[in-house]
């Protein structure tokens, strides 16, 4: 088989080290990415219905790109910020 082997991207692009420079812990990274991926997924689901309750991707996307990959790129580029809730 000639040619170049496929390059896996997924969680390796963007690299975890770059993402951890933007957020304060790996736990907040997981929470932010999961919440944003759910928002992006809901946005795409609502497009066909004409409802635009959520904000779409803030970065250029490729066809068939996963919402989690989009969310991780948004975090790396500093387009998302996390606000901590103060205990009452």
Curated annotation (Swiss-Prot):
- Keyword list, A-Z: DNA-directed RNA polymerase, Nucleotidyltransferase, Transcription, Transferase
Gene3D superfamilies named in the record = 3.90.940.10
**What's the EC number here?**
2.7.7.6
- Tell me which InterPro entries the record gives: DNA-dir_RNA_pol_omega (IPR003716), Pol_omega/Rpo6/RPB6 (IPR006110), RPB6/omega-like_sf (IPR036161)
Record-linked Pfam families: RNA_pol_Rpb6
Gene Ontology terms for molecular function: DNA binding; DNA-directed RNA polymerase activity
Q: Does the keyword Nucleotidyltransferase apply?
A: yes
Which reactions fall under this protein's catalytic activity? Answer: RNA(n) + a ribonucleoside 5'-triphosphate = RNA(n+1) + diphosphate
Please provide, in alphabetical order, the Gene Ontology terms of the cellular component aspect for this entry. DNA-directed RNA polymerase complex
Amino-acid biosynthesis is among the record's keywords? no
> What NCBIfam families does the entry give?
rpoZ
Biological role = Promotes RNA polymerase assembly. Latches the N- and C-terminal regions of the beta' subunit thereby facilitating its interaction with the beta and alpha subunits.
* Name of the molecule in the record: DNA-directed RNA polymerase subunit omega
């Amino acid at each position: 088989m000639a040619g170049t082997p496929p390059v896996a991207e997924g969680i390796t692009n963007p690299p975890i080290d770059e993402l951890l420079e933007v957020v304060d812990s790996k736990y907040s990274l997981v929470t932010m990415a999961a919440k944003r991926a759910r928002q992006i997924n809901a946005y795409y689901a609502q497009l066909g219905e004409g409802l635009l309750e959520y904000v779409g991707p803030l970065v250029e996307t490729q066809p068939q790109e996963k919402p989690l990959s989009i969310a991780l790129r948004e975090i790396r580029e500093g387009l998302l910020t996390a606000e901590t809730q103060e205990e009452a």
